[in-house]
From Swiss-Prot:
Residues 1106-1249 form the MHD1 domain. The modification Phosphoserine is found at residues 239, 241, 244, 255. A zinc finger (Phorbol-ester/DAG-type) spans 566-616. One of its GO terms (cellular component) is Golgi-associated vesicle. The keyword Magnesium does not apply. Zn(2+) 1 binds at residues 580, 583, 608. Residues 185-458 are annotated as: Disordered. Zn(2+) 2 binds at residues 597, 600, 616. This is Protein unc-13 homolog A.
Amino acid sequence: MSLLCVGVKKAKFDGAQEKFNTYVTLKVQNVKSTTIAVRGSQPSWEQDFMFEINRLDLGLTVEVWNKGLIWDTMVGTVWIPLRTIRQSNEEGPGEWLTLDSQAIMADSEICGTKDPTFHRILLDAHFELPLDIPEEEARYWAKKLEQLNAMRDQDEYSFQDQQDKPLPVPSSQCCNWNYFGWGEQNDDPDSAVDDRDSDYRSETSNSIPPPYYTTSQPNASVHQYSVRPPPLGSRESYSDSMHSYEEFSEPRALSPTGSSRYASSGELSQGSSQLSEDFDPDEHSLQGSELDDERDRDSYHSCHSSVSYHKDSPRWDQDEEDLEDLEDLEDEELPEEEELEEEELEEEEELEEEELELEEEEEVPDDLASYTQQEDTTVAEPKEFKRISFPTAAPQKEDKVSAVPIEAPDVSKGIPKAATPEEKAAAECAQEAEPPKSEESFRSREAEEGQEGQDAMSRAKANWLRAFNKVRMQLQEARGEGEMSKSLWFKGGPGGGLIIIDSMPDIRKRKPIPLVSDLAMSLVQSRKAGITSALASSTLNNEELKNHVYKKTLQALIYPISCTTPHNFEVWTATTPTYCYECEGLLWGIARQGMRCTECGVKCHEKCQDLLNADCLQRAAEKSSKHGAEDRTQNIIMVLKDRMKIRERNKPEIFELIQEVFAVTKSAHTQQMKAVKQSVLDGTSKWSAKISITVVCAQGLQAKDKTGSSDPYVTVQVGKTKKRTKTIYGNLNPVWEENFHFECHNSSDRIKVRVLDEDDDIKSRVKQRFKRESDDFLGQTIIEVRTLSGEMDVWYNLDKRTDKSAVSGAIRLHISVEIKGEEKVAPYHVQYTCLHENLFHFVTDVQNNGVVKIPDAKGDDAWKVYYDETAQEIVDEFAMRYGVESIYQAMTHFACLSSKYMCPGVPAVMSTLLANINAYYAHTTASTNVSASDRFAASNFGKERFVKLLDQLHNSLRIDLSMYRNNFPASSPERLQDLKSTVDLLTSITFFRMKVQELQSPPRASQVVKDCVKACLNSTYEYIFNNCHELYGREYQTDPAKKGEVPPEEQGPSIKNLDFWSKLITLIVSIIEEDKNSYTPCLNQFPQELNVGKISAEVMWSLFAQDMKYAMEEHDKHRLCKSADYMNLHFKVKWLYNEYVAELPTFKDRVPEYPAWFEPFVIQWLDENEEVSRDFLHGALERDKKDGFQQTSEHALFSCSVVDVFSQLNQSFEIIKKLECPDPQIVGHYMRRFAKTISNVLLQYADIVSKDFASYCSKEKEKVPCILMNNTQQLRVQLEKMFEAMGGKELDAEASGTLKELQVKLNNVLDELSHVFATSFQPHIEECVRQMGDILSQVKGTGNVPASACSSVAQDADNVLQPIMDLLDSNLTLFAKICEKTVLKRVLKELWKLVMNTMERTIVLPPLTDQTMIGTLLRKHGKGLEKGRVKLPSHSDGTQMIFNAAKELGQLSKLKDHMVREEAKSLTPKQCAVVELALDTIKQYFHAGGVGLKKTFLEKSPDLQSLRYALSLYTQATDLLIKTFVQTQSAQVHGGKGTRFTLSEDVCPEMGSGVEDPVGEVSVHVELFTHPGTGEQKVTVKVVAANDLKWQTSGIFRPFIEVNIVGPQLSDKKRKFATKSKNNSWAPKYNESFQFSLSADAGPECYELQVCVKDYCFAREDRTVELAVLQLRELAQRGSAACWLPLGRRIHMDDTGLTVLRILSQRSNDEVAKEFVKLKSDTRSAEEGGAAPAP
């Protein structure tokens, strides 16, 4: 920085003398100075001005103005580049410059002028040379400094990648003070915005406009001119900023501050800088070394202005014993050269020794991890460092004492790389290395010189020492010594005082990635202690800070704000123009213009009196002291003393608590109380401070212009000093970044910051003449100076000045304060943190054994009460006195509580606290539209610190919730409430992230809790699985004998038994129930998203299912357990699923898997169950048999065996049913297998009953067979019920088919049993029917019965029915009682058939031979009569039986004899009428009025139909019967198949199909002829030949062919012809013709030819060989044809034919009938010499 001196001498104007009344303004950087106004065309001002210059790329603007009545006009201007201004310590004659009329602008800055005028001005401008150091001495020191630089360059440290450029010496400077570091003062463009907390850093803007630097000049009104940002990357920039390189990863804008290391009288320097974003942490290099070049161009300006006020510089040691008052250095003389050299050489030697020591120590010590992990652990108190006289090294002791780390500033930016070895070594050196000896020697020497009062040290030596110390500091830092050597009080950069309190330098860069064991250990520690102490208790070990806070606390409490004296205002009349002390507005009016305090004399508007809240007594004391009113002052002091005594007497507990909290001895406390009282009495008279204010930016301002915008600028006033910023045109969110410096000597002063809208119009010009402020008011904020300390970056809401003000928005200020005597103290916010944390530690850990004592407070502000009454008053008064916001108090208390968040009741308090913190930041007010994130970013607590605190708290809460069952046991209602509050706290953290941090999608609290619950359940399941037997034995085993220890190898599941799984299910249920009943009501904040009971069931089931599935697969391979055990386990699993899992949304619409696990075991059980059921069946039948098949009850008609069998089956089915298998496919498998079991069991029952049933029927016990039939029917009934129970129509198709098939089989069995039972009555019925026949034969009378004889017929019918009715009546009555209805009907049907068939074959159609043969015939024949037909269907068995009967009687001749011998049994018409009537009676009897068989069944019964048909045939003539036979019997030989027709007998056709047993064929030619006149029909038959005859005989075979015509009305015609016989020919040729005459009344369809091949035998009857039948209807269309007829062994006929044959067989007197019977009864004779013919 250089000092520019400008002398405005005189000017020459072109114009009249009276025209000019001119003054000159000088503008450079952002400072404007103005001369007085002088009249005339050749004015002479002769005024000198001085400016601090830190940028030589700008220019000096000189403007000459002519003063006017309303506004001023510019005469001309000239722009002088600063680079062209000479350097000299002497004034020159000046230079005449021509004024131009216009300025040339570039980027809103003047860069030249144009359009010359005729006016000229004489100016003398020069830069003052720094000191008066001789050239020779300057060269000497430059050489020495180069040697030191060379030493530094030889040391290979981590920033060697990009060395600083050589420092050129411009020719215009006699000495380049960049060598000494003074040219490098604006080395940190980031210092104003970048707090160590990163609280006030803008995270979104990387394009903040260039900064504006301001320096204070006497008599200068402050205007603004921008300067370009200072270059980056100097060595000093690094040396001042080693503490901040953990923030490199954050891109940030250049800082607005331009504070100099050595500021002018009105300026407070920022002192230290921070490494800019251009520093590359990976390459450890500084990018760009333009700073040196720039600094080369800056000249040193004034030793006075650069040294005397630079108390905030790190190169200014504040220890009084180390450094004299710097202002006195101006007058010190230069020491002797020899002394200087000697000292310098000593220093060099010590540096070299130190360098060697450091190189030896570069290896990383073993305990480096203890440092690198200090982010999470408290660092032990390091060794005391001796204070070094170097300004940069001096604060080392305080730093090490207070090196309790807080947090890396920005967790969200990611963890930086692990520290390099050089950094680790540097850190170790910073912790362990003893300070060099030279420090103590130099320090002691300097102290001695100060004590001896030697004033010989000159400015040169002082400056050289500073340069020397700076270089040495750089060397130390390069080796790592200076890394941690910054003091807590170090004022470098914004928030420099917070460097140790609120951040952890180098931690994020240096901390290596922890090992797994480290992580595990840290988790264990976090479980015990909560959040790490680095976040919660950063000041407990900082004794120096605690000592200071102790004093400040006493000061705040001995005379608290709440006890201050208010002003005594009264209405006051001003006699001269007076301005309001508060708003600086004129007190308008003629009289009674405002208010005046009678005590301290402050004047203000009536509306402003409430804004003046400073203590009146102290203001009065200050004022009277300054004005010499000592008596008045003494009175005030006495009042103050009394008040403090009263305070101490009334509230002794407060001061006792303070003493105990800070562990101060009683004597020291007493002394300190006296000192504090005296400081209060001294008041503000001895108080002074330096204030540096950076106006950063504003947001959301009011629009005052018609364009909808404003042109805002800011005025800052401290006391009577007022400065302003540059105007930002047309912007409601302006950015100024301008820095102002003030001196303040009154702690009751206020900083008044006003935002105004610049108006450049006539109205504004006029207003300017009458008002101090002609511009529109946009808002203001008033800041009490007493609330400032250290550095702070704060957003202030803009307030109204009057009720009419339209104000909105907020302004951001960076304020740095140095209070005399407290230069090294931390900001009040840090001091408050120290107080609060120590108080919390004392109250919680010391007094209450680590348990947080929660105050009992109620009301809306209860959350602001942190302690009991005494402790709360301490923190509140401290906060009130020193301007600590309540939100800062809340955040600090939240941080303290975070270390005890697991203590009872704490989560609820933390949740409430955070909710109110959220509300404070997220709920913006109407007066500002600043976003929540911006408001939070401006938090004095530290944005990154609080975010990291929440992040770490969030992680810890998640870990604790992941073990909620241990940390919050369900047995403790208090802990359950804490659990609920913990979730509320998580919700508040989520709200904070979403609303305050404005993160896009932070993890939802409900999801976080859900994940934690699942994690806990996973671990819980694993625990109970691994310790199942032990836990079960402890919790549920009541039998002491069973509580034996389970061997470790049997702790888990076994394939030998299933006990483990049953116990595990019990434990799982207990877990789910606990979650359902205890934790679900507790964690009810998210009813739609989180239900702990349901999640518990879901997780437990999922894990259990996985293990159970694998276990069952293993069991399936070995099958070592009983199937019943598997079934029992299946039921337990089913219950578990249905009770807790089935209704869960995840499983609701899914088919569960568990039935599939047990399917093999259920099938196994069903297999075994079938065997059991069969055994049970046999046992039941045996018991039933022994008991005689007794009815189970009076109303039950079946015996107990059926009940027993189905009871067992139903029990088995109930077990399957109770499985409630939800898988339809598996249910189908079960049903199929069980259906087979049912089928096998019931069929076996039916088989056993069927085998023995006949034996029961043979006995005279009708009851037992009936009960057995009832049992069979009951099987069918119960089967139907079981079918419905198993699903009915919904039953599996295969199972359903099995059961239906079983039902059919049982039905057939019942039919068979009924038939057997009815057949047992056959002998009795046949006997009764014979008796009926006998009675019937006695009925006399022939012909039709007249109507008059009906009564006699009825009587006869009754007589005939008597025998059978007696039998039926006696049995059917019994059957009706003991038979099931269905069984009864079946028995009745069988009896009905038996009665009908017996009557038919005994009465209507008596047998051809004995009764046995006829009975057999009819029985077999009866089977074909069930289809309900009027004409009986074809059935060949009857004919065959007649033939067989004939064969049994021997030859046909015997049959004829038999028939002749039989009495004529043909029924008369009357007898037929009697039989008809009897049939009706029997039918009515079997119907039994609806109780028995249905009438429709009886009417359509084929047996009745057959009987009636036979009766009807009795009345028909023989011809009609024969006609009926021919028309109905179309399949008498080979089923009517095999017959072929040709046109000529010469053509032999192929063999016919359908002939299964061919015995030959015969060829005949038949021709039909009808006489056209008479209608007489003739048939000519030509017997051609016989072929393939099959016949064996012992004698000569002499075959011949006999042809018979069969039909009606042939009694008078020839009916038979025969050919001649052929000897021994089996294919004889005959060629003989015969002619038959037929009746004209019947057509060919009524006739047939029967061809019979016979073997001629002499003296005996011819033997029949084969038979064939040709029905003439087949020739009706042909007329004539050659017929090939297959020969058969016999004639086949159906029932009709058989009936006709039997009726005709009884007509012994009718030749035609006898012939017909013989013809149709003929059959193949027995062969001789061979086997008998097949039947």
